[in-house]
Amino acid sequence: MASNGVDEQIKLVEGPAGYVLEDVPHLSDYILDLPTYPNPLQSNAAYSVVRQYFVDEDDTVQEKIVVHKDSPRGTHFRRAGPRQKVYFKPSDVRACIVTCGGLCPGLNTVIREIVCGLHFMYGVTEVIGVDCGFRGFYSKNTVALTPKTVSDIHKRGGTILGTSRGGHDTSKIVDNIQDREINQVYIIGGDGTQKGANAIYKEIRRRGLKVAVAGIPKTIDNDIPVIDKSFGFDTAVEEAQRAINAAHVEATSVENGIGIVKLMGRYSGFIAMYATLASRDVDCCLIPESPFYLEGKGGLYEFIAKRLRENGHMVIVIAEGAGQDLVAESIEQQDASGNKLLKDVGLWMSLKIKEYFAKHNVMDITLKYIDPTYMIRAIPANASDNVYSTLLAQSAVHGAMAGYTGFVSGLVNGRHTYIPFNRITERQNKVVITDRMWARMLSSTNQPSFMNPPKGTTEFTD
């Protein structure tokens, strides 16, 4: 029997010394007298040697680990992992997986490990993949997924299920979940996708359905808050090195050579910052969070000329969302997911630098522009991201089988946790330019901060 309380997703449990647990919803919150079953892992020979494999219900993970001695204990999240009791009989489980939004290294690994985790750890045999994002739910496009069909997909880029932006119709999606008798839904996507997943969870709860909704957060830009990082990010940074290395070779092979590399980062410059730190060949890194200006004392043009006179070459890394206020009126258009369409700041920057140096007869330059954006996101995950994606997928499976719903699995301070949907969709994670990591990057490039444009120049307004 179902109870009311669709909006009761935020579950706060308070304890002594300022302890707060931001708990995730559970099927038992709105369905009474749910039966439980022994976890099949108890009889799984592979796990018989693992001591204390099951997670204690009281285990939580602290959100902030750097505190003062008198600070309150702060916010915690429920620790991820298998429980001794599960709320689904494996023979009754009919699970589905959907991928939405842009591509990202590791998508196929997550798909594979959800399928294999359900099958080998819990004995679930019915798993289907939903084709091409949310709209696949109501366009009748599905594919059967078995350990055999997904055995080597982690070696490929992209997603075997296809993906799309938009197409979210909550009522139609839940109607089809109900019609197909699906009782576990795994949704892989970014913040927009997880907002859609939250809407699906709420509608399922409103209808009183025994359906667990689990999210695996995905963004190559690493702009999802709370979690340590997104899967695919390490691969993206590693692959970005190839473009930066090529730009460095081009720049050093000619007199006054400039190499410009545009990397992904619509609103957050993490890929650009970490790729710059990893490369050590970059002279200037420009990201959306750090304003800059072009002309005048201390501007970008002056810095480029200075660096060329000193070294005879220069490499610039720019995130796709950097300097949009400097670009001629940005277009007021959005993609199907509601993301603002940006002008190509890398191409614009290349043209502006060429024009300035020619117009002012500063010096002859040779400029090469490299845009590896889609190459970076379309490759398979590296070893680190494959392991990370595996653990995220397995955590989601453990959570759904244990009856949790309306959550994403994520790494917080090195521990896998279950996080309420609202916590990862309420804001975007951004580079903090007053933080140590940005200072480390500045010390690597020795670039100016560009924070104080002189009078008479065009200022960047945040």
UniProtKB/Swiss-Prot annotation:
Name of the featured protein: ATP-dependent 6-phosphofructokinase 6
Site note Important for substrate specificity, residues: 192
Record-level GO BP terms: fructose 6-phosphate metabolic process; glycolytic process
Protein keywords: Acetylation, Allosteric enzyme, ATP-binding, Cytoplasm, Glycolysis, Kinase, Magnesium, Metal-binding, Nucleotide-binding, Phosphoprotein, Transferase
UniProt modified residues of type N-acetylalanine: 2
Catalytic-site annotation from UniProt: 221
Organism: Arabidopsis thaliana
Main location group: cytoplasm
